[in-house]
Amino acid sequence: MSEPSYDHQVDRSHMQVSDEIAIQISQMNKWYGQFHVLRDINLTVHRGERIVIAGPSGSGKSTMIRCINRLEEHQSGKIIVDGIELTSDLKNIDKVRSEVGMVFQHFNLFPHLTILENLTLAPIWVRKVPKREAEETAMYYLEKVKIPEQAQKYPGQLSGGQQQRVAIARSLCMKPKIMLFDEPTSALDPEMIKEVLDTMIQLAEEGMTMLCVAHEMGFAQAVANRVIFMADGQIVEQNNPHDFFRNPQSERTKQFLSQILGH
């Protein structure tokens, strides 16, 4: 297998992985009724890691990352995020969610609020940040995702790529320690995908701990320090990008890569 490529020069100077554990998943299982959607998931994520999760549709990859901030409830096993175990305790769930940002396939912006209001809503109401400070932070992150001029517009006035960059900026306004991305480009037109991936690369370059469900293998090659392949609710294989693409071990992984890389 040859390696995919991505048209972006990535600065890895700040991409340091520490020994500190950000996420620990042990023997996690989840069912939807009789359907066993996640099977004995074990995963350790260190602070500063950039992990891309790949796999066919229905493999459980989106469900797994949604369990990390309790958008989905696991039935057995342990999930510990930033030292906090995720149980049914609402206080623990709120603590974890305050440390974990999440960006979805669909942008989930409030259509009746301006872009600036979308970004300041959670900091003001959840973190009790003063309005002026929240607005300054929001403008800082809109600058970072390169759309400060859109602050007073409404979501419907922006392109899909711009809306997704707003969604990323909105998550960053809560100062998360970990960012989760659930197929953030799959609802975008092809010409808008790169602008969102470039924003995510910038986050990675700054040392953000990231888990990303994605189909862009060139992005995985450029940014990830680990690629995880899932199928049938299990982690089938995981490795650094070079070895994952050059020398996949599992037949299931080889089959998947041959389909998406076209050889």
UniProtKB/Swiss-Prot annotation:
Span of domain ABC transporter: 23-257
Keyword ATP-binding assigned: yes
Top-level lineage group: Bacteria
GO cellular component, one term: plasma membrane
Single annotated GO MF: ATP binding
Pfam families for this protein: ABC_tran
Database matches in InterPro entries: AAA+_ATPase, ABC_ATPase_HisP-typ, ABC_transporter-like_ATP-bd, ABC_transporter-like_CS, MetN_ABC_transporter-like, P-loop_NTPase
Gene3D superfamilies, per the entry: P-loop containing nucleotide triphosphate hydrolases
Membrane topology: Peripheral membrane protein
Binding-site positions, ATP: 55-62
Subunit comment: BztB and BztC form a heterodimer which can form a membrane complex with a homodimer of BztD.
PANTHER family: AMINO ACID IMPORT ATP-BINDING PROTEIN (PTHR43166), PHOSPHONATES IMPORT ATP-BINDING PROTEIN PHNC (PTHR43166:SF4)
Family note: Belongs to the ABC transporter superfamily.
Protein name, UniProt field: Glutamate/glutamine/aspartate/asparagine transport ATP-binding protein BztD
Species this chain originates from: Rhodobacter capsulatus (strain ATCC BAA-309 / NBRC 16581 / SB1003)
